[in-house]
Every structure is written in C-alpha cells, then in structure tokens.
Amino acid sequence: SEEWDKVRGEASPYGNAWDFRTNREGLLRYWGDALKERGRYENMITIGMRGERDSALLGEGSPVEDNVTLLKEIITAQRGLIRSLEQEGLVRENAPQMLAVYKEVEEYYYGNEKISGLYQWDGLDGVICMLSDDNFGHLRTLPTSRMREHKGGYGMYYHLDYHGSPVSYEWVESTPFSQVWEQMTEAWDY
C-alpha cells in the first residue's frame, strides 16, 4: 500500500518486508499503531492480508493450503491484537471487523479439495465478510444457504471505477446505472 511504502525500511520500527512469515512483529506493530491512532473512532476494522500491490498472498502458483494456513495465522494474530487494545481502551469496544474477499484471496476463502476455506472457519465468527464483484460491475457470487449461517453477515464491494491491471477505468461513467441497479438489487434481494 502507499501508506506502507511511507513507513517501511531497514531502519523502520516496522521493518521492510510486507511478509507476515518474515516480518510478523513489524507488521503487528504497524497494525497496532494504526489501531491506537484510529481505533477509538467509529469505523470498521479490516482484517486479513493480501500480497504486496494487491497480489496473491504467497505469490502466484503457491499452494492454496499454504495460503489458507497463513491467512488463518494472520487473522488470529490480528483479532488477538484488536482484543488486547480493546481491553486497554485503545480500540472502541465491539468495533465491527471486516474481511474483504477480493479476487486475490477468494480461493482461500472457499478452499479446495485439500483444505476447507475460511468461510467454514470459526475464527471469522462475528466478522463481516465483504464479497467482491469482478472489477467490471458484475457480482462474482452471493452467499449460499450454508454461507448465510455465518455469524457476522456479508457486504458487497462494487466497482464504479477501477484502477489496476490489466486495464484501468477511472472517473469515467463506465458502469451503466441500469447495471448497478440490477446487480445491487440482486444482492439486496438475495
């Protein structure tokens, strides 16, 4: 992220690597300082992690199982940090927490034949899971009947413009209002 680029470095108290395996303490310190600064305000706390520059967490081609295991470790540490700061009065009590199920982590959310994904994991109880569109204004998924049992509920991330590879469309009315209405009505009615 742009914010991480401003604070990272060899001499930084947060370290240089956006990698939980090699820079766990630095990232927890970074997230903790952000929570201490902003946690008493009315806001939603995002949890989870993607790779640098919105990439896959452990890189392209890495096994889903390894990514799911690491993401569970990250979320467990983040939720522990939030609870700890909440007890100290540095984070608003019961502030909502949200996991964004972007395309980079969607496979880890659902899992595969070798590992259950995050959506069946009780470590996300009480967390809002924000599903995402396909970057072009089309819903990727809606919660199944089993997913609807999730304690925390769901939200929807919807692009009206997009900045990213392979194409960017920004500040241009590129998603017709009729499509926005149709897609968001489908999500609402579901």
Positions of predicted regions on the chain:
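Catalytic domains of carbohydrate-active enzymes, especially glycoside hydrolases
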Residues: 1, 37-43, 183-189
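Short, charged, surface-exposed secondary-structure boundary motifs
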Residues: 6-10, 139-141, 165-167
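Glycine- and acidic
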Residues: 12-16, 56-65, 161-173
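Structured mid-domain segments that build the active-site/substrate or prosthetic-cofactor binding neighborhood
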Residues: 133-135, 144-190
